[in-house]
Amino acid sequence: AQGPHRDQFVERFHREARSAAAIANPHIVQVYDTGEFDGLDYLVMEYVHGVNLRYEMNQQGTFSVRETLRIIGETLDGLASAHRAGVVHRDIKPENILLNDRGHVQITDFGLAKTVSQATLSSTGILLGTAAYLAPEMIEKNQATPQGDLYSVGIMAWEMLAGNVPFTSDNPVTLVFKHVHEDVPSIATACKGINEGVAAFLAHLTARAVEARPADASVALTELQRLQSTLAVSDWQYRLPPVDVSASDSAAPANNGAPTNVGNPVPPAPPAPPTQQFDDRTRKLDRVKTNATTVMPVQQQN
């Protein structure tokens, strides 16, 4: 890491290692070690063979309720372990949700994570995270909370079902203004006929007031499991016909450099007891073990 913000970058880098290493969960990319060699900071972490959720979104356009809730459920399971350890991710977005070659979620990039007890980072003057998924309290007060992670998860689920995020703008200032001053519209406005319970669950995650959301990911996961037990087959199968991929690509937030292994995407496995075969049209990834290690040198982004 070089440049005027080197010390701040290095601190964030080592914080990522400490945060991720403290959490043991199959839905979080495992960090094994960190250090410095010849002036180069490095991170030793689990190698995940697969794609990120953004890649899968670009391929599919929209997701069924079944696919969406399974991915969201595994994301909440990983975040529940983080929240129990006192760690908030701060930057949940599709680029940071990896789908391994079995189709399961592994959350990555805890570089923006911070323990709840740490001082706010507002003094740095840097707005961390991605505007399309930022919770109102992060924008207004740089306040990192478990509920902020849930807001981001809810926006991500909204995008998976509808094919686009609820708030869009070419101007990031306008975008964050909407998150602070407008309620996230019901997913039912974009997905006519979707189950009312699914819409209510997303509304709970994306409530504008932090106290109106579930207390943490564990509470949200319990709520999701209750919802899943009430869904009929037709509710699970609901899917909005995907829009033209070339048009949706321009509206979706760009991949900001999160690690991605480019290959054919892997559709998620069904969450409910009735099983179904994976769709062969997208399952052609070469198989490698995901418990291999990767030594990743880290350079400061300019």
Residue ranges and their predicted role:
Residues 1-22:
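AlphaC helix of the eukaryotic protein kinase fold
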Residues 211-293:
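Juxtacatalytic C-terminal regulatory tail of Ser/Thr protein kinases
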